[in-house]
Structure formats: C-alpha cells, structure tokens
C-alpha cells in the first residue's frame, strides 16, 4: 500500500499550468461584523435549500500544504448518496490520476496504473493517505456549506456558513469558508480552507452541478 498511497504525492506534485494555483489562494476570512443566530429565518431557509441538494458534482482545484511538501491537483467530486461518492484527482501535465470511491463496503483507492485497494475502515484509509484523520463522510456536507446541526459554527451577515471546528480522533480541523459563488441561489462555496495546525487543505470550486 505504501507505493499506492505514495502515488498520491507523486500524482499531485505536478504544478498546474495555465491557471492560477490554489496554493496561492488566501486563507483568511473577513470576520463577520454581525454573527447571525442559528435560528435566524433567512439562514434556516438557506440551510433548507442546501439540504435539498442531494446528488451533486463539484470540480476545481485542490491544494495541500505541510512543512514537508506542497502540491496541487485538479479534482472532480461526484456525490450521489452517503455510501456512493467519488473523488478523482489529476494533473493537466500528466496522464496520472488517483481516485477514491466510497461504496457500501468501505472505500477503494485506485490509480491510473491499475493498482487498487479496498478498506472497510474508511477513517484508517484516509489517515494512510494524508497522514491524519480526515472525516471525508462529513466533508460531503461541508463542501456545500452545510454544517452539522449540533456543531458550533458561525454564520455571517450574508447567511452563509463562515467557519467551524471539527475534532476527529484527536485532530482538530478548523474549517473556514473564504469565498462563495454569490451569482447563484443558494450561494455555494468557492474557496474553503481546512487547517489542523500542521497541514492546510485549500479547495477551490470552479464548477457546481446538481
């Protein structure tokens, strides 16, 4: 499995040509001048619209930063159900790609060279891939700007999810929504930054479909 998980870095290390890299995207958000309560009617209306988006796809760029390395990739996220979604990462400078596919048996990781592995323990596989626990099942909702109902999150004056923290297996992820696509209803995230103290994930979503 070392060769397969190592391929993630080898696949993504290729710089993205012809476009502005997500690695240079800002990480800070403008702190809300007014914090909107969770029972606010407009926020609840927005939340209801997000909840109705069941199957969707998101395409854009993914960036990873740690003390040891930096890399970026194109990504294609296809979500159908909680046990049927996939993430494909690729470079426009190489034919190499890597795919994560969630199914009822767990998760399968495969590469463009034909290697694959399936694990029932999704959390363990994600930790092997990026080195720390990452809640990819919850991420399926976060990427829409939809928080968990009982979580401690912040809503900005535009009735958008602004930020929240999420602890998983001793790792605290700080999630910030830096920018939204405001030319569509409901507003959907354009730039999301996740940090855990030593690692930063930047996700820029260029295209939404649902």
Curated annotation (Swiss-Prot):
Keywords from the UniProt entry: Cell outer membrane, Chaperone, Lipoprotein, Membrane, Palmitate, Protein transport, Signal, Transport
Lipidation (N-palmitoyl cysteine): 19
Principal place of residence: membrane
Lipidated positions per record (S-diacylglycerol cysteine): 19
Compartment(s) where it occurs, according to its Swiss-Prot or TrEMBL record: Cell outer membrane
Membrane topology classification: Lipid-anchor
Gene Ontology terms describing biological process: lipoprotein localization to outer membrane; protein transport
Domain of life: Bacteria
Signal peptide as annotated in the record: 1-18
Stored InterPro entries: LolA/LolB/LppX, OM_lipoprot_LolB
Matches recorded under Gene3D superfamilies: Lipoprotein localisation LolA/LolB/LppX (2.50.20.10)
Cellular compartments per GO CC: cell outer membrane
Quaternary structure, from the entry: Monomer.
Family: Belongs to the LolB family.
Protein purpose: Plays a critical role in the incorporation of lipoproteins in the outer membrane after they are released by the LolA protein.
NCBIfam families: lolB
Name listed for the protein in its UniProt record: Outer-membrane lipoprotein LolB
Gene name of the encoded protein: lolB
């Amino acid at each position: 499995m070392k060769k397969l998980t190592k391929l993630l870095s080898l696949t993504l290390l290729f710089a993205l040509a012809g476009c502005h890299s997500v690695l240079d995207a800002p990480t800070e958000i403008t702190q809300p001048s007014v914090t909107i309560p969770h029972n606010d009617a407009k926020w609840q209306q927005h939340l209801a619209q997000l909840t109705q988006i069941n199957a969707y796809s998101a395409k854009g760029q993914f960036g990873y930063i740690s003390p040891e390395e930096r890399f970026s990739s194109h990504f294609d996220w296809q979500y159908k159900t909680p046990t049927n979604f996939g993430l494909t990462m690729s470079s426009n400078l190489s034919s190499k790609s890597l795919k994560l596919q969630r199914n009822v048996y767990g998760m399968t990781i495969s590469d463009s060279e034909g290697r694959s592995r399936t694990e029932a323990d999704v959390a363990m596989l994600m930790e092997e891939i990026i080195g720390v626990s990452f809640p990819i099942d919850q991420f399926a909702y976060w990427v829409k700007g939809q928080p968990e109902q009982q979580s401690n999150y912040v809503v900005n004056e535009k009735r958008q999810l602004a930020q929240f923290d999420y602890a998983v297996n001793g790792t605290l992820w700080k999630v910030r929504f830096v920018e939204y696509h405001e030319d569509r209803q409901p507003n959907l995230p354009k730039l999301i930054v996740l940090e855990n103290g030593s690692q930063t994930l930047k996700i820029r979503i260029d295209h939404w479909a649902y």
